[in-house]
Design a protein with these regions (language model features):
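Glycine-centered flexibility motif
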Residues: 14, 21, 88-89, 194-197
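Bacterial Sec-dependent N-terminal signal peptides
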Residues: 1-50
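Generic detector of intrinsically disordered, low-complexity, polar/charged segments
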Residues: 1, 20-22, 46, 65, ...
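Short, low-complexity intrinsically disordered segments
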Residues: 2-3, 147, 173, 188, ...
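Glycine- and acidic-residue-rich phosphate-binding/metal-coordinating active-site segment common to enzymes
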Residues: 153-158, 162-219
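Extracellular or lumenal secretory-pathway regions
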Residues: 44-148, 152-155, 162, 176, ...
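Short beta-strand element of the conserved SAM-dependent methyltransferase core
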Residues: 6, 17, 57, 166-168
Length: 318
């Protein structure tokens, strides 16, 4: 492992960002490469299919900040499909898989907006979701339910595609969508799908959540399923050790209830870790990095600590 770390540092040091790394009250000046790239290199991953295309969506969530002021949070997600399996996940992860490596700071939006990685029909007849919520990574399982769509008369042109409208109620929210039969794929963003064409836009009836097709790429890309990650963490003596980080498995309904309890609490927007131990007390270290906008991001074993939370707006109510 020591030789592997030396090779990684020498090959990737040109991409490093330097930051003070705190370990049990002490400060060390280290290259971020030592730990931010370990997810990609040491994750236990399976290729469960090869997608022939990737659909990119812009997701917007209308909410309020800690002062109660209205804000709209945006992020992008990628959707792949192969042999009945669909993966919907943050665009940054898709981009990292194509380019190699990993930047924890790029995962901040997914953590702030509580957008997980969703495998539809994997395993067969089930939906598997992987999501970070400090201090753990969670994996949930639920039945794959048929979405009963009602086709309506609306027509529009979205991202250059002729589209028709439809509506359904799913997990407590009513969704109004447009889809195009020009792309004969029965998929869409997040957990939505089952129409006779690609979903190009989806908005809940309250106007809080909106997914809009942003791009469509015909390309062969592997659909990756991550079982667990092995993280490199400091031992407090200036050296590193490896730590296997498993997902905490829960029923989807139990995790949804837990998120409502934790994220729906009024204290969350003022103190986003109120419900968990202080990271320095519990883990003895905090990783620091910067996202592309220059904002500092803190994490523990790759799990992002949200520093600027907004009011939680669930994508499903039950």
């Amino acid at each position: 492992m020591e030789n592997w770390m030396k090779r990684m540092k020498s090959k990737l040091v040109c991409f490093a960002e330097h930051e003070i790394f705190r370990v049990k009250g002490k400060k060390f000046l280290l290259t971020m490469v030592a730990f931010v790239l370990t997810v990609a290199a040491l994750a236990q991953r399976d290729t469960i299919g090869v997608s022939k295309f990737t659909a990119i969506y812009r997701y917007e969530c209308k909410t309020t900040d800690a002062d109660g002021q209205p804000v709209t949070d945006p992020m992008y997600i990628a959707v792949q499909t192969s042999s009945g399996v669909t993966k919907s996940f943050p665009y940054e992860e898709y981009d990292r898989q194509k380019k190699g490596g990993s930047r924890i700071a790029d995962s901040y939006l997914a953590a702030q907006m509580h957008m997980g990685t969703i495998f539809t029909n994997y395993p067969e007849g089930r939906i598997t979701t992987q999501e970070m919520l400090y201090p753990y990574r969670y994996m949930t399982d639920e039945p794959l339910e048929k979405q009963n769509w009602t086709l309506t008369d609306g027509q529009d042109s979205i991202s250059g595609y002729a589209c028709q409208s439809a509506t359904t109620k799913y997990h407590g929210l009513t969704w109004n969508v447009y889809y195009t039969e020009e792309v004969p794929a029965t998929i869409g963003p997040w957990k939505l799908g089952g129409l006779p064409g690609l979903i190009t836009k989806a908005t809940d009836a309250n106007g809080i959540h909106t997914f809009t097709l942003y791009g469509f790429h015909q390309e062969d890309t592997p659909i990756i399923y991550t079982k667990y990650v092995t993280w490199i963490v400091p031992d407090g003596q200036g050296k590193f050790t490896t730590q296997r980080v498993d997902y905490q498995e829960m029923k989807a309904s139990d995790f949804l209830a837990y998120k409502k309890k934790v994220l729906g609490n009024s204290r969350y927007v003022k103190n986003p870790t109120y419900y968990a131990p202080d990271p320095m007390t519990a883990f003895g270290y905090v990783e620091k990095s910067y996202n592309p906008t220059g904002n500092q991001v803190s994490s523990v074993a790759g799990v992002v600590i949200v520093s600027n939370p907004h009011q939680y707006q669930p994508l499903e109510l039950k």
